[in-house]
């Protein structure tokens, strides 16, 4: 069996209950897996010290692909604002901000987000993921998605949802392999500066 397919190491998870919402607050301590190039990938929850690197990640990835919602010049968060955002993710039940690292460098980010505070939405979560282009195709996105979905189930979610641009064939193929199914198309979801439009696919997976 290839190294990148081996089971990941035992992970230590700190879980706190939120009795009112019925979902869990989770901090994922570092776990390690091998990618297709036999590089060690560390997966862990983000903390406040990651703010600067996350801001850089947002600016770079938004310029590398047409499949994200923001242009690079729209990333205007200050370091303090990003620190506050990370802190809120650490403290909010039902949220996980997962970072992937190789040799101490952030290579990707995957988030588990609640769909809102309403009790009738408490069974649903949203997944979002992006990697630096140079690290795509090495199995890192898959391992991050697998980890995020496992933790989402542990937090009490019953289904995971995501939105993906219709032209993003590689991402859609990965999501379908992981059990996501399309349930709708949103025409003209995004409009680019050159006047082109892009549709989006809504996808969902039962956990």
PLM feature segments, named:
Residues 75-134, 146, 206-207:
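Acetyl-CoA-dependent GNAT
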Residues 24-76:
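A short, well-structured alpha-helix characteristic of acyl/acetyltransferase catalytic modules
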Residues 137-150, 154, 173-177:
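Conserved acetyl-CoA-binding loop-helix of GNAT-fold acetyltransferases
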Residues 145, 168-171, 188-193:
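Short glycine/proline-centered loop/turn elements that form peptide/ligand docking sites
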Residues 161-164, 176, 181-196:
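Conserved catalytic-core motifs of GNAT/GCN5-like acyltransferases
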Residues 152-163:
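Conserved GNAT acetyl-CoA-binding A-motif
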């Amino acid at each position: 069996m290839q190294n990148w397919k081996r089971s990941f190491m035992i992970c230590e998870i700190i879980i706190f209950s939120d009795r009112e919402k019925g979902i869990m607050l989770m901090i994922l301590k570092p776990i390690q897996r091998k990618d297709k190039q036999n590089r060690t990938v560390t997966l862990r929850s983000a903390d406040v010290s990651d703010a600067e690197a996350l801001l850089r990640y947002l600016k770079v990835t938004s310029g590398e692909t047409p499949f994200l919602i923001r242009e690079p010049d729209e990333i205007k968060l200050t370091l303090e604002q990003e620190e506050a955002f990370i802190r809120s993710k650490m403290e909010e039940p039902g949220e996980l901000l997962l970072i992937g690292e190789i040799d101490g460098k952030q290579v990707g980010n995957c988030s588990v987000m609640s769909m809102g505070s309403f009790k009738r939405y408490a069974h649903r979560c949203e997944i979002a993921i992006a990697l630096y282009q140079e690290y795509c195709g090495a199995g890192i996105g898959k391992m991050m998605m697998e980890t995020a979905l496992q933790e989402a189930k542990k937090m009490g979610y019953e289904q995971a949802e995501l939105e993906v641009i219709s032209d993003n064939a590689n991402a859609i193929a990965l999501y379908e392999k992981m059990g996501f199914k399309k349930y709708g198309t949103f025409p003209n979801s995004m409009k680019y500066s050159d006047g082109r439009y892009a549709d989006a696919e809504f996808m969902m997976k039962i956990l």
